[in-house]
Amino acid sequence: MRIINVIHSLLLVVTLTSFCSSQVKASSFKTGQLKNSRVKDAYDNKWGPLQIELKAANINPNEFDIYMRAFKQDAIVEVWMKNKGETKYKLFKTYDICASSGSLGPKRKEGDGQVPEGFYQIDLFNPKSNYYLSMRINYPNASDVMLKEGTNAGGAIMMHGDCVTIGCLPMTNDKIKELYVLCLEAKNRNNPVYIDIFPTKFTEANLKMLEANYPKNKVAFWNTLKPAYDYFEEHHWLPKVIIDKNGKYFYEE
């Protein structure tokens, strides 16, 4: 299991306590969600076709792990999946991010309009969102708290429907239905839903662009994200990401 020091050891406990306290039957979470008309509509319209796509990709619709990577400059979210018990993820689908706010670089305070960058999980599903459906990203993590500017790092960062945003990931109502269903299916089986957010893909050309156009403190931060990014690029497996006492990311195999 991927663990991020304080983040994935403590917040994973919070997540599991919130959604499946004392090992409540896995189906109860999904059953509760399906009482909401938007979730039911998402399942009625998307789950059948998604199951066909999953089977075509040799993914068992009844038991899978999901991992998402968001790239701000590229304006995409990659959905990677694997069967439970397998070691390697495979790219399942890529979705466009409909709108953006802020600039490349991490979120450091409330109201800065920034989309966070770092290593996160989906920790809440909102079936009655003002933006159709939404899933909360567990920002701020321990690193964000340590590196915040001022007294408040901000929060309530969502992946949601519609096509407007201040610091979130808007996916349109149509695409959030698919993403919500896929993530809900994983969460319903007590599987964590990881999402990592990067400024861009760390290609050689993009690294040169970042170094040429952004201040050294941002480049230094991105250099702490890159090793875990590179590890996944090579192995298609999530490394253990750790946060040190200064809020810096590093990883272990």
Positions of predicted regions on the chain:
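Cell wall/extracellular polymer interaction/catalysis modules
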Residues: 24-166, 174-187, 193, 202-253
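Positively charged n-region of N-terminal signal peptides that target proteins for export
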Residues: 1-5
